[in-house]
């Protein structure tokens, strides 16, 4: 963008516009319309500059005074400060810049702000904040960042106690870093340096296109030439925001510049040499840094590393030439022999080579097949421990009585579900299993062997598998062993079956409903605990129970004298021992 001429200052144009009675924005609108109508070509060519001027003009307040200043970006990303009147359309006019100060005022202003930011401990927070805002309004360039070293001063404010100052400093730092990265990645052609002849020829071929294709010379896109200047521009641009040591930065710059510069048209050997050189210098630096020596001891290793670096580069550059010479010497006699042979012998030679390659391929396939088809070692089968047959078993005999049915007054029932014939003949004694539970709930039979470890957790697991069925039981509340030889108490929360909901009016219907429920639950129990020996009634009990036994159970109905509210939802199991 062209800079404003000193002869045509803002004061002159203010007086010119104030002489008219029209609004300044109306003048702008009509001026654009007249220019587009009367000078269409010139207007089209200058439309980009007009749009750029609209977005590049920024007004900022001067530090230490209430004077407003206009910042206009120039062609070379320079910053121009022009005085602006602070009183609106009819206010006082600002001070115009002089002809000699116009080019250097931006650098001087940045240097002045840098001095303020460097003395951050002595300055007030308001002054620091205004200085950062002034820097934000300026359009910085890489040259200004390099000359003024403003990045160091702003970097020191990234961890300021004030949130506004630290946030603004981080924002400025990120923008400048992005600007420097963009400048680093820009090709030499875009940065203003001379390109290679190949790139010039390509640009001449593609000059009719809007955007010519990039040249094929990849050295133009290498960021090494700009890397040396970048380290000088922003020394403090590290990831943690800490300033780097001057000695380390200089040493790293020297190593980067020596390794980064390479002439155009270099071969692969130079690339390998540069890579090895970088690796060697990094290892040497890692070995040298932890050691603490005197000044003379430090200078001598630097000279030695320089000499060793040069020797390595020259040796690596000589290696490819020696290898190529050896290949040429070996290839020379073979080519002479091939030239001396006739076409038939050449054909035989090629055929022999082809067969050898086929044989090598087949051998490789066989080796791979042999490796894959190795014999798998036999795995030892894990033998399951055989359980000894227990000499004594404990069988559970069970009874239950019903609690009061909701909405009805039904008598308490005592049903003997065991076969009366077997109970009197095969067992010396049997005790009751009393379950205080509504009649429309399911019950369960548990068979416990003496060989098993009878504890609370084992019984709890067995009960939880059998009792937590759909439409029967929600969950077991607790399991406790009162006496391992006599009683087992299981407390659980029961769940009503919807299909038995308030349809029982007589004791006969109640007994039938209970019989169906028992049949369903006993079938599940028999699958979970199958009988081990059919001579024992522990397993035959499931098979003998059928609807015909309901008549026998109905004959044994009696009225329970105890109240049902004494043990709500509680199971009391008694068992006896019988010889196997």
Swiss-Prot record:
<feature type="compositionally biased region" description="Basic and acidic residues">
    <location>
        <begin position="244"/>
        <end position="255"/>
    </location>
</feature>
<protein>
    <recommendedName>
        <fullName>Probable mediator of RNA polymerase II transcription subunit 26a</fullName>
    </recommendedName>
</protein>
<comment type="subunit">
    <text>Component of the Mediator complex.</text>
</comment>
<feature type="compositionally biased region" description="Basic and acidic residues">
    <location>
        <begin position="280"/>
        <end position="290"/>
    </location>
</feature>
<keyword id="KW-0175">Coiled coil</keyword>
<dbReference type="GO" id="GO:0005634">
    <property type="term" value="C:nucleus"/>
</dbReference>
<keyword id="KW-0805">Transcription regulation</keyword>
<dbReference type="Pfam" id="PF08711">
    <property type="entry name" value="Med26"/>
</dbReference>
<keyword id="KW-0804">Transcription</keyword>
<feature type="region of interest" description="Disordered">
    <location>
        <begin position="244"/>
        <end position="337"/>
    </location>
</feature>
<feature type="compositionally biased region" description="Basic and acidic residues">
    <location>
        <begin position="299"/>
        <end position="309"/>
    </location>
</feature>
<dbReference type="InterPro" id="IPR003617">
    <property type="entry name" value="TFIIS/CRSP70_N_sub"/>
</dbReference>
<dbReference type="InterPro" id="IPR035441">
    <property type="entry name" value="TFIIS/LEDGF_dom_sf"/>
</dbReference>
<dbReference type="InterPro" id="IPR017923">
    <property type="entry name" value="TFIIS_N"/>
</dbReference>
<dbReference type="GO" id="GO:0003746">
    <property type="term" value="F:translation elongation factor activity"/>
</dbReference>
<feature type="coiled-coil region">
    <location>
        <begin position="347"/>
        <end position="368"/>
    </location>
</feature>
<keyword id="KW-0251">Elongation factor</keyword>
<keyword id="KW-0539">Nucleus</keyword>
<comment type="similarity">
    <text>Belongs to the Mediator complex subunit 26 family.</text>
</comment>
<feature type="domain" description="TFIIS N-terminal">
    <location>
        <begin position="108"/>
        <end position="183"/>
    </location>
</feature>
<comment type="function">
    <text>Component of the Mediator complex, a coactivator involved in the regulated transcription of nearly all RNA polymerase II-dependent genes. Mediator functions as a bridge to convey information from gene-specific regulatory proteins to the basal RNA polymerase II transcription machinery. The Mediator complex, having a compact conformation in its free form, is recruited to promoters by direct interactions with regulatory proteins and serves for the assembly of a functional preinitiation complex with RNA polymerase II and the general transcription factors.</text>
</comment>
<keyword id="KW-0648">Protein biosynthesis</keyword>
């Amino acid at each position: 963008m062209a800079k404003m001429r000193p002869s045509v200052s803002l004061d002159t144009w203010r007086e010119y516009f104030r002489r008219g009675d029209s609004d300044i924005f109306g003048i702008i609108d009509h001026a654009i319309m007249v220019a587009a109508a009367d000078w269409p070509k010139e207007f089209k060519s200058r439309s980009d500059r007009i749009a750029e001027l609209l977005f590049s003009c920024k007004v900022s307040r001067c530090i230490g005074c209430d004077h407003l200043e206009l910042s206009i970006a120039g062609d070379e990303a320079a910053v121009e400060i022009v005085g602006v009147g602070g009183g609106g359309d009819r206010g006082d006019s600002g001070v115009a810049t002089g002809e000699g100060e116009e080019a250097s005022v931006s650098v001087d202003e940045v240097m002045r702000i840098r001095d303020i930011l460097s003395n951050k401990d002595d300055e007030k927070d308001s002054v620091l904040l205004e200085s950062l805002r002034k820097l934000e309004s300026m359009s910085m360039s890489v040259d200004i960042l390099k000359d003024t070293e403003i990045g160091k001063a702003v970097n020191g404010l990234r961890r300021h106690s004030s949130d506004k100052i630290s946030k603004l400093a981080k924002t400025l730092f990120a923008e400048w870093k992005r600007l420097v990265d963009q400048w680093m990645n820009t090709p030499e052609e875009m940065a203003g340096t001379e390109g290679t002849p190949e790139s010039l020829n390509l640009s001449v071929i593609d000059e009719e296109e809007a955007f010519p294709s990039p040249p094929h010379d990849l050295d133009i896109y290498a960021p090494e030439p700009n890397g040396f200047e970048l380290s000088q521009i922003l020394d403090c641009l590290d990831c943690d925001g800490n300033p780097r040591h001057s000695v380390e930065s200089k040493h790293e710059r020297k190593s980067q510049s020596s390794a980064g510069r390479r002439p155009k048209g270099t071969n692969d050997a130079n690339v390998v040499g540069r890579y090895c050189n970088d690796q060697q210098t990094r290892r040497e630096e890692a070995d040298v840094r932890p050691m603490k020596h005197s000044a003379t001891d430090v200078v001598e290793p630097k000279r030695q590393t320089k000499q060793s670096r040069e020797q390595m580069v020259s040796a690596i550059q000589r290696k490819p030439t020696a290898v190529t010479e050896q290949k040429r010497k070996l290839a020379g006699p073979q080519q002479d022999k091939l030239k001396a042979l006739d076409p038939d012998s050449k054909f035989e030679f090629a055929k022999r080579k082809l067969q050898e390659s086929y044989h090598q391929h087949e051998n490789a396939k066989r080796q791979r097949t042999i490796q894959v088809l190795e014999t798998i070692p036999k795995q030892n089968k894990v033998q399951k421990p055989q359980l000894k047959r227990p000499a004594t078993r404990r069988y559970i005999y069970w009874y239950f009585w019903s609690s009061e049915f909701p909405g009805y007054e039904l008598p308490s029932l005592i049903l003997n579900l065991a076969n009366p014939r077997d109970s009197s003949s095969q067992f010396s004694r049997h005790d009751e299993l009393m379950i205080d539970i509504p009649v429309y709930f399911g019950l369960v039979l548990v068979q416990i062997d003496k060989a098993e470890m009878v504890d609370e957790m084992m019984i709890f697991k067995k009960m939880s598998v059998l009792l937590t069925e759909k439409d029967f039981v929600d969950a077991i509340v607790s399991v406790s062993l009162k006496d391992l030889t006599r009683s087992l108490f299981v407390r659980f929360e029961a769940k009503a079956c919807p299909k038995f909901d308030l349809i029982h009016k007589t004791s006969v219907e109640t007994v039938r409903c209970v019989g169906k429920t028992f049949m369903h639950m006993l079938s599940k129990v028999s699958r979970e605990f199958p009988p081990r020996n059919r001579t024992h009634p522990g397993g035959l009990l499931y098979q003998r129970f059928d609807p015909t036994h309901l008549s026998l159970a109905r004959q044994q109905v009696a009225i329970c004298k105890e109240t049902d509210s004494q043990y709500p939802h509680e199971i009391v199991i008694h068992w006896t021992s019988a010889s196997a």
